[in-house]
Curated annotation (Swiss-Prot):
UniProt name for this protein: Probable transcriptional regulatory protein HRM2_04000
Swiss-Prot/TrEMBL keywords: Cytoplasm, DNA-binding, Transcription, Transcription regulation
Molecular-function GO terms, alphabetical: DNA binding
A GO cellular-component term linked to this record: cytosol
SUPFAM superfamilies: YebC-like
Signal peptide per UniProt: none
Superkingdom, taxonomy of origin: Bacteria
NCBIfam families from the UniProt entry: PRK00110.1 (NF001030), PRK12378.1 (NF009044), YebC/PmpR family DNA-binding transcriptional regulator (TIGR01033)
Membrane spanning residue stretches: none
InterPro entries to which the protein is assigned, alphabetical: Integrase-like_N, TACO1_YebC-like_2nd/3rd_dom, TACO1_YebC_N, Transcrip_reg_TACO1-like, Transcrip_reg_TACO1-like_dom3, YebC-like
Length: 247
């Protein structure tokens, strides 16, 4: 299970730059709007909206922006009607890729996504071609400065977590999506600061990439991250730390 949060952490560091912040806000606003449209504007009764708002607050999104996004979703303000699309395919070295999109123009999005895959030497596949390789899980990341593994095991497992793992520079708590909020709440109630918390797709197995393929994969993920219509992407690539550090 090693490396679940590696790319999320890298994206988080990159996202701290001012040049990236506007793009991050755009994607968060889309997610908040769609979450409010589908489940209503009350974060207490809408888990998806609650997660989106938490992510927005973690990025210091202004309160006015956040509230406007919710109102656009509930129809209190006029907004764009986004469609959710999932693309599946293969990247460098044949790694499996899932790409989640929110778009107001499906033709534009498929053209952009297809181009990104093609440029990386990959291709978009048929529905279901790689989704079976991933499990939907809650993922909570905690710095080793915040807690120790025994404490997290006690707090997490008692609240319904499936596993607690040592990932070198941090601990990861894995949950069933249905237990995510309860486990997250228990960790916070114990006074432990959470570094990152999200419901994500975790690969059942990973494909190791080395050398040029690994470098190509990092550039591919960068391109996916830069596409406005792509909200999230997941892969089963296992990339050496030194490749990340060198790029």
């Amino acid at each position: 299970m090693s490396g679940h949060s590696k790319w999320s952490t890298i994206k988080h560091k990159k996202g701290a730059a001012d040049a990236k912040r506007g793009k991050i806000f755009t994607k968060l606003i889309k997610e908040i709007t769609v979450a409010a449209r589908m489940g209503g504007g009350d974060i207490d009764s809408n888990p998806r909206l609650r997660g989106a708002v938490a992510a927005a607050k973690a990025q210091n999104m202004p309160k006015d922006n956040l509230e406007r996004a919710i109102k656009k979703g509930t129809g209190d303000l006029e907004g764009v009607d986004y469609e959710e699309i999932l693309y599946e395919g293969y990247g460098p070295g044949g790694v499996a890729i899932l790409v989640e999109c929110l778009t107001d123009n499906k033709n534009r999005t498929i053209a952009d996504v297809r181009y990104i895959f093609s440029k990386a030497g990959g291709n978009i596949g048929t529905d279901g071609c790689v989704a079976w390789m991933f499990d939907k899980k809650g993922l909570i990341t905690i710095s080793k400065e915040e807690s120790d593994e025994d404490t997290l095991m006690e707090v997490g497992l008692e609240a319904g977590a499936e596993d607690v793992t040592d990932e070198g520079d941090c601990f990861e708590i894995i949950t069933d999506p249905a237990d995510f909020d309860a486990v997250k709440g228990a960790v916070e109630a114990a006074g432990i600061k959470i570094e990152m918390a999200e419901v994500t797709m975790i690969p059942q197995t990973q494909t190791r990439l080395e050398g040029k393929e690994a470098e190509q994969m990092v550039r591919f993920m960068d391109a996916l991250d830069d596409c406005d219509d792509i909200q999230k992407f997941y892969s089963n690539a296992d990339i050496p730390d030194e490749v990340y550090d060198a790029m």
